Amino acid sequence: MSQVNMRDMLKAGVHFGHQTRYWNPKMGKYIFGARNKIHIINLEKTLPMFNEALTFVERLAQGKNKILFVGTKRSAGKIVAEEAARCGSPYVDHRWLGGMLTNFKTIRASIKRLRDLEVQAEDGTFAKLTKKEALMRTRDLEKLDRSLGGIKDMGGLPDALFVIDVDHERIAITEANKLGIPVIGVVDTNSSPEGVDYIIPGNDDAIRAIQLYMGSMADAVIRGRNNVAGGTVEFAAEETQAAAE
């Protein structure tokens, strides 16, 4: 079972929240106090919630379900892409396109266009075009790859979302909520936990903290896949219901 410990979180600065004047009262029960006008997150509450989320992800992966990693702000994008690739999970690291979940039919068509352009780039088609047309297609390919490259192999809707900054990725969370897709999210002291099924109260800005979240989640996916034993997609719905109770 994938687990993190208190020392890991302290070293990563998970306990440092935002300035006290920016706090969200809905996160009050996860705040230990304040130091130099910075809220300090109660890691004794974060620890079991983080590990519960890791267990959920591991069991999902064990059932061959897909977890979509989402982190599009500058401090998160590179780490999200690297760790998602390490565990073979889909990811969004550049910009969340509206309708990425709720209008997946259109997104699927864009992914097909991306794949077609990739084939053309490799089979010499671009070389046969005029310079202007080749440049236009190359730019189109780069744009599509930046937006959709992380989900081109997803194959369908994900079974869960893992989100680094719930404020920054609110559109993604809203879409997941509409479709009944469970959401795991890192929630800082300035954010609202609404719409998040598995809350991880913690610093969503520090690079080391983001590395801890993403590395731990990727490890959970890998561990789950290495222990495949009859999990099912229905498990996600069961866990969501249990979390709501």
Curated annotation (Swiss-Prot):
User: What is any one GO biological process for this UniProt entry?
Assistant: translation
Question: Which GO molecular function entries does the Swiss-Prot or TrEMBL record give?
Answer: structural constituent of ribosome
Key words, A-Z: Ribonucleoprotein, Ribosomal protein
Which parts form a coiled-coil structure per UniProt?
none
The record's listing under InterPro entries reads:
Ribosomal_uS2 (IPR001865), Ribosomal_uS2_bac/mit/plastid (IPR005706), Ribosomal_uS2_CS (IPR018130), Ribosomal_uS2_flav_dom_sf (IPR023591)
Q: Which CDD domains match?
A: RPS2
Pfam families per the record? Answer: Ribosomal_S2 (PF00318)
Any one GO cellular component localisation term in the record: cytosolic small ribosomal subunit
Q: Which PROSITE patterns match?
A: RIBOSOMAL_S2_1, RIBOSOMAL_S2_2
Highest taxon above the source species: Bacteria
Signal peptide location: none
NCBIfam families, alphabetically?
rpsB_bact (TIGR01011)
Q: Which family does it belong to?
A: Belongs to the universal ribosomal protein uS2 family.
**PANTHER family, A to Z:** 30S RIBOSOMAL PROTEIN S2 PROKARYOTIC AND ORGANELLAR, SMALL RIBOSOMAL SUBUNIT PROTEIN US2M
Give the protein name, as stated in the record.
Answer: Small ribosomal subunit protein uS2
Gene name, Swiss-Prot/TrEMBL: rpsB
